[in-house]
C-alpha cells in the first residue's frame, strides 16, 4: 500500500514508529531553517517537520507548494511542550520526515483552501467543487453524511426492512411539481419522467408482499429553488404493511432518535404530537419551530366592531384572520427595528404591521387614559373595553409589545408565522437546541385559487372516515397523515395509503380526475389494488435537509457533493447544455428557435 496511516489518525499510540502518509499540503511554513508542512487528507491534518539533516527531503519540501500531493515517510514524535494543538486529533504529535516523494504538483488554486472563513462566491466554489471539497469543513460534512447514511441503513436493516431499488425512468404523475422529462428513442414522441418520489412503486412493493421496504432514493423535481431545495435530491424512502399509523411513527421516531444519539450524542426524547389545526392556530405554520415559545392568539372576535377597517374587515371575513403576537420585553424595540419587521412581513404579502406597546397595563384596567398606558397609532380606534380584553387575552405585561396580523388567513399565517420565528431568533428566545415534533390530522384537501381541490399531501393518502363521508364532505375530510418537524423544518412526511379501488376512485373524483384520466395515468395502480392490497403506509425523509440541520449548514448545497445552483445549473460541468443535432434527430426532437422579438429582448 502507498500509505500506512491517514494524516488525521496519527496519535500518541504511534510514537516512535516509522509510518508513511499521503495527502495534500494544507499549509507550508519556514521557521529558522526548518520547514513545517501541514499535510491534509480526509481524516484530518498532521504536522510534518522537515529539517536540513535530511537534505533530499528538505530540497523536495523547499520546492513544494500548497496543494502539492506528497508521500512522506518518517518517525512519529511528541510535539514540544507548548506547541500542541488541542483542536486536532493529531495535535500532540508530529512527523519528522525522512523521505518525501512528490506524487503530483498543483497550480495555485483559484481560492484559498486553508481559510476557514472563505469569502468567495458560491458559483466559483461550485465551478471548482473538487477543490472546494478539499476544505476541512466540506470534508467533515461529507464524512458526516456518509456515516449518517450508514447509521440509517443499519437501523432499518435491524428493523427487518429490505433495501429495494425502484426505477428512475418512469412515467409522469401529478405529484405537485413539474417532472423532468426524458424522450424515448425507441418510441418517438413519448417520454419517460424522472421520479419525484418512488411513491407508486413502493406501494406496489407492498402489494407484492415485501412488507418492510426502504431505499436511499434519488428524486427529481423541476421547481423553483430555495435554500432547502434542489432539482435532484436524496430521500430516505420507507414503506410498511400491516402496521398502524402509531407503529409507523414509532419506527421512524426511533430512527431519528438513534441517528442523533449515534452522530451527535443528543437525546431527543419523546416527540410531542400536535394537530394541524393546533399548529396553524398557535404558530401559523404546519411546521412550527417549538424552540421559540411565542404563540399567536386569535382576536378576530374582539375586532369585529372596531372603527378600524384594517382589522374589522378580516375579522368579519370567513376567510380572514386577525391574530396577535405578544413579545415579552418587546417594548424595547426601536422604531427602526419595527420598520424592519414591517418590511419583513411584506415579503409574505402583509400590507403593514400594526403594534401596541404596553407601558403600564394598570392604567387601562383602572380606567385611566389609555394613551398613558399604551403606545400605538391604532389605539384611538379601539374602545377601552376592547383594549382591556386584548391585554387580558394576550397576557401582556408592562414592557411587552403586541404585533397584529389582519388579512386573508393565508397571508396572516405566512407573515405572522415567519415573524414569530424571526423575532424569537433575533431576541435569542430559543428554549432548547433541538425541538422535534409530529404534526398530524392534516386536511385531506386544500382549495386552490380557482376553487378546485388539490391534495394536501398526495392523492394516494388514506382519508379518515368512509367513502361516503369523503364524497359528502370533502372540505372537512382529514387524512391519516403525519409530518416530522425539527426546528421549524419539515424533515419527513408520510401517511397511510389507500388500499381499495373504491376509496382511490373517490379521492380521484374529489380532485376532479376523471375515470378516463385515472385509467390512463394510474391503471397499473388501480389494477394492483384489485388483487389484495394490504393496509400499508410509510414515510420519506429528505436526507439533504436533515444533514443540513445536523451539521448547522445554511443550505443543502453545502452537504451535497455536486449540487446545482439556485437556477438549477451546474457550473462545474456547464449543465444543462445544448446537445448534438444528430442526437436530437434520433429522438425525433427539433428545438424551436426563439422568435425574433424574444431574441431582441
Curated annotation (Swiss-Prot):
Cellular component terms per the entry's GO annotation: cytoplasm
Residue positions binding L-aspartate: 175, 221, 457, 497
Disulphide bridges, residue numbers: none
Gene3D superfamilies: Bira Bifunctional Protein, Domain 2, GAD-like domain, Nucleic acid-binding proteins
UniProt-annotated site: Important for tRNA non-discrimination, residues: 31, 82
Keyword annotations of the record: Aminoacyl-tRNA synthetase, ATP-binding, Cytoplasm, Ligase, Nucleotide-binding, Protein biosynthesis
Localisation: Cytoplasm
PROSITE patterns from the UniProt entry: AA_TRNA_LIGASE_II
UniProt entry tagged with the keyword Repeat: no
Domain of life of the source: Bacteria
UniProt KW Protein biosynthesis keyword: yes
NCBIfam families per UniProt: aspS_bact, PRK00476.1
Recorded family membership: Belongs to the class-II aminoacyl-tRNA synthetase family. Type 1 subfamily.
Name this protein carries in UniProt: Aspartate--tRNA(Asp/Asn) ligase
